[in-house]
């Protein structure tokens, strides 16, 4: 684990440098509109996502599609969870599917930006960075016949703790997940102050590295409180990873959209259309329905409309989904990982 933390910090640092240098390789096509997209991409139709390259020679039609899912928990868990779907995707597209485990949001975004990742599920917050900096085109999320269920930001504490409301946590140990996370970091900075608790002023967020790590840390007494995504927390309780009676919720937000599924903008349009068809004709088996809180299918979404509330949160926290914010957040994430590694390796007194 210590070695992985060190590797994560090193990788994030390298990504930070690579992002700066690669920005100079601007798209040479005549681009009428780019919006907040990186200079590698163009958005002539103003739908806020990258258009397919105008030069058809840049379209990709790989023999194997690389698929990843957001690292909200141990990546190995989701490799097994998604196996029924990746098997279906292979049969439906006629291509080999490679599941690519990622250990951080930054690693997943950089993998798509560099062309090593073709289809991916991104967490709610990092979706914006994936769109603007990696050319991701979100088209689906998990849902039911009634549409998208979404998730809530939960502020959780130990059930035997004295805390009853957010303002009780002033000066306490509060864990956030990672800098780019919506419910784990950005949304609390907007939603907590009206409830009497200001991150950075009333407490210094401790980056745990994930929603599962935050929840487990609260249960273990390492943290006094943590904002976590309700869908991740509910899956942990259902799986027995954490006992529901150990935890009490003292705050619950309005609904946010859950993780998006996106394809790389430079996939051959026929292939991108086929991938979407494969997503929408797949019905979740019982194992996936159980894992995803009753969701039984993929539901069509578009980034411009369905992520408006998330973009608003990002803007209000001073973390718009642009390169400067990404570089700052990635650097902070790398520093948090390095600090955590030092703490883990420090000799116990």
Describe each model-derived feature in a short phrase:
Residues 9-20:
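Bacterial N-terminal signal peptides
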Residues 23-107, 291-349:
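N-terminal hydrophobic or amphipathic helices and topogenic motifs
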Residues 70-71, 145-154, 241-279, 286-309:
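Periplasmic-binding protein-like
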Residues 96-103, 201-210, 248-251:
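Short beta-strand-to-loop elements that line the ligand-binding cleft
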Residues 109-168:
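Acidic, polar ligand-binding/catalytic clefts
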Residues 112-113, 169, 218-219, 261, ...:
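Hydrophobic residues within well-ordered alpha-helices
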